[in-house]
Amino acid sequence: MLDLKFIRSNPEKVQEGLNKRNKDISIAPILELDEKRRKLLAEVEKMKAIQNQKSKEIPKLKKEGKDTTELMNELKELSDKIKELDSQVKEVEDEIEKILLTIPNIPHESVPIGKDDTENVEVRRWGEPRVPDFEIKPHWEIGEKLGILDFERASKVSGSRFTFYRGLGARLERALINFMLDLHIEKHGYVELFPPFLVARKSMIGTGQLPKFEEDAFKTTDDYFLIPTAEVPVTNYHREEILKEEDLPIKYVAYSACFRAEAGAAGKDTRGLIRQHQFNKVELVKFAKPEDSYDELEKLTADAEDVLKHLGLPYRVVLLCSGDLGFSSAKTYDIEVWMPSYGRYVEISSCSNFESFQARRANIRFRRKDGKLDFVHTLNGSGLAVGRTVAAILENFQQKDGSVVVPEVLRKYMGTDIIK
């Protein structure tokens, strides 16, 4: 959520920032409501001053033995008017908050201006894609042939965009989760959380999924939501708390299943593991001081990249342009892994700095050493999406005979060096 005071003081700057997103977003309604609210508050203060003045007259009149009935009636009328105005103020404030919750974050000044993903900027590459002397099979095909992925039975059980992992496929998924957690905990210094997979509406609002993206979420009949990412419960872990400056940055890593309706994704990557309704992910979440958050974004992105380096998977890092930026993000790097059967790089992680956008919604602050309270900056990134990593391994390490070589760092988890 954007700061109303900042919007009021910098309307042109805010509108200019929102215009960079290439969407029709106007702050005019908020400014109008804010002006209405301030006028109502001024009227309330004026009436309260009159009320206080008249209240002081009552003891004097009583002391003089005079009738206070008329004055008491005036005070009753004033009290009723103040209550009515307070009610109007509450209505206007609720309307302001309702609109604020639908307005996205302002892109950071370092974000390139562009209309969509075609104008994202490649930052760097790592690793060289293999050029095999045989035709690469797509991961779903080789997975089914090896008997480690079963899409057909998953479709029978649950419908489209679900998968059964079987045998060494299930072990590979589990090995990746454990490897990613161990790497981030032991090498990168994150603290592990194992979060609930169901959250309340307030938590989804806190991280920016609601109200704007409710159609993309799976919701229970009693208003709980299946999490689309561990970002939601882990960020809300410190909701409505005041943290200590000396404890920042706080770094969490969490494995969770993720659930997404993928509304509007028809026809996109419909086969295989790339776009599923349910998938596993290891998430990195940070709480940082505002002055440190962009350094922390670079470190977080490097931590996610490190997983791919250890696995030996070629990838590139892309800086998202303003038109492709997520709703809550001020700046995002996408990490894209090379997928041979696609002939292109495919997103496997998004690493974002939300600045104070989520912290304002979730009321997460910290106390500076001088006693001043400030909102933290929140960051997160996939470290990594597990199903997509499985897909990348099956495609990048498949052999001519149809087997798949297990990356060296996974062999102690897998108990084998090859899937055949």
Swiss-Prot record:
GO molecular function: ATP binding; catalytic activity, acting on a protein; serine-tRNA ligase activity; transferase activity
Function, in words: Catalyzes the attachment of serine to tRNA(Ser). Is also able to aminoacylate tRNA(Sec) with serine, to form the misacylated tRNA L-seryl-tRNA(Sec), which will be further converted into selenocysteinyl-tRNA(Sec).
InterPro entries, alphabetized: aa-tRNA-synt_IIb, aa-tRNA-synth_II, aa-tRNA-synth_II/BPL/LPL, Ser-tRNA-ligase_type_1, Ser-tRNA-synth_1_N, SerRS_1_N_sf, SerRS_core, tRNA-bd_arm
Gene3D superfamilies, sorted: Bira Bifunctional Protein, Domain 2, Serine-tRNA synthetase, tRNA binding domain
Alphabetical list of NCBIfam families matching this protein: serS
Pathway noted in the entry: Aminoacyl-tRNA biosynthesis; selenocysteinyl-tRNA(Sec) biosynthesis; L-seryl-tRNA(Sec) from L-serine and tRNA(Sec): step 1/1
Main location class: cytoplasm
PROSITE patterns named in the record: AA_TRNA_LIGASE_II
Record's catalysed reaction(s): tRNA(Ser) + L-serine + ATP = L-seryl-tRNA(Ser) + AMP + diphosphate + H(+); tRNA(Sec) + L-serine + ATP = L-seryl-tRNA(Sec) + AMP + diphosphate + H(+)
Assembly and oligomerization: Homodimer. The tRNA molecule binds across the dimer.
Name by which UniProt lists this protein: Serine--tRNA ligase
Organism, scientific name: Caldicellulosiruptor saccharolyticus (strain ATCC 43494 / DSM 8903 / Tp8T 6331)
Aminoacyl-tRNA synthetase as UniProt keyword: yes
Residue sites binding L-serine per the record: 229-231, 283, 382
